Amino acid sequence: MGALTKAEIAERLYEELGLNKREAKELVELFFEEIRQALEQNEQVKLSGFGNFDLRDKRQRPGRNPKTGEEIPITARRVVTFRPGQKLKARVEAYAGTKS
């Protein structure tokens, strides 16, 4: 299974909307930059019909070096999470079925 890339999204904008290739690439970059900036400013990103990007703080926790077995602390950090919306979930389940 392949992955959809930013270049492929730009190519689809070029084909579907008639933007020139430079404009399509800039539009894709601008879209993702807006999401990045919002998250950097601790804002939630809500894309109606798609899902939400949130920031979540994870506490420090114990970890283990798999090679040596030595216990090492995993430092506290902030992570980005994505929660798909109901419409996205429904479409994915309709096409892919539910997999366990």
Swiss-Prot record:
SUPFAM superfamilies: IHF-like DNA-binding proteins. Residues 53-73 are annotated as: Disordered. Gene3D superfamilies: IHF-like DNA-binding proteins (4.10.520.10). GO terms for biological process: DNA recombination; positive regulation of metabolic process; regulation of DNA-templated transcription; regulation of translation. It holds the Pfam family Bac_DNA_binding. It comes from the Bacteria. Keywords: DNA recombination, DNA-binding, Transcription, Transcription regulation, Translation regulation. One of its GO terms (cellular component) is cytosol. This protein is one of the two subunits of integration host factor, a specific DNA-binding protein that functions in genetic recombination as well as in transcriptional and translational control. PANTHER family: DNA-BINDING PROTEIN HU, INTEGRATION HOST FACTOR SUBUNIT ALPHA. Belongs to the bacterial histone-like protein family. NCBIfam families: himA, PRK00285.1. This is Integration host factor subunit alpha.
